[in-house]
């Protein structure tokens, strides 16, 4: 579930910013709501600080989610949320982010939506 949590946290941040929310205010509101999770509270600060120093890595979630999906396939069990998250991590790895922190999956949503949280990122 960690990979899905990280992907949805990145998606929520990009969506909220696109809707006009202040990134730090959005983080605080969700942190105090039922939508919060350990992954939200741990990974979103990396996004807000543009700090993708690897504590874990995109490539790890590409591998781990592939294992989960393979098991689901063997059991003939649908895993649509896992599959969607896996595709976002694959996109991040394909963009050259495989060895950076898994929270950098946000950069996929950033690229797709055109949102920017940090001024340093605006030209990227």
Listing of model-derived features with the role each one plays in the protein:
Residues 20-23, 78:
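Helix N-cap / loop-to-helix initiation motif
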Residues 36-103, 107-109, 120-121:
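Interdomain hinge/lid region at the active-site interface
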Residues 1-19, 30-42, 56, 60-63:
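Active-site-proximal catalytic alpha-helix in oxidoreductases
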Residues 115-124:
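ATP-dependent carboxylate/acyl-activation modules
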Residues 22-32, 83-87:
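Beta-strand segments within the central parallel beta-sheet cores of soluble alpha/beta enzyme folds
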Residues 6, 10, 14, 26-29, ...:
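N-terminal hydrophobic or amphipathic segments with adjacent small-residue motifs
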């Amino acid at each position: 579930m960690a990979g899905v949590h990280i992907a949805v946290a990145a998606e929520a941040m990009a969506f909220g910013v696109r809707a006009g929310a202040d990134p730090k205010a959005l983080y605080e509101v969700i942190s105090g709501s039922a939508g919060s999770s350990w992954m939200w509270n741990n990974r979103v600060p990396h996004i807000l600080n543009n700090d993708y120093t690897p504590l874990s890595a995109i490539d790890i979630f590409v591998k781990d989610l592939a294992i989960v999906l393979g098991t689901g396939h063997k059991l003939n069990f649908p895993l649509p949320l896992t599959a969607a998250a896996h595709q976002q991590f694959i996109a991040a790895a394909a963009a050259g982010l495989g060895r950076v922190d898994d929270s950098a999956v946000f950069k996929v949503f950033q690229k797709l939506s055109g949102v920017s949280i940090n001024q340093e990122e605006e030209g990227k």
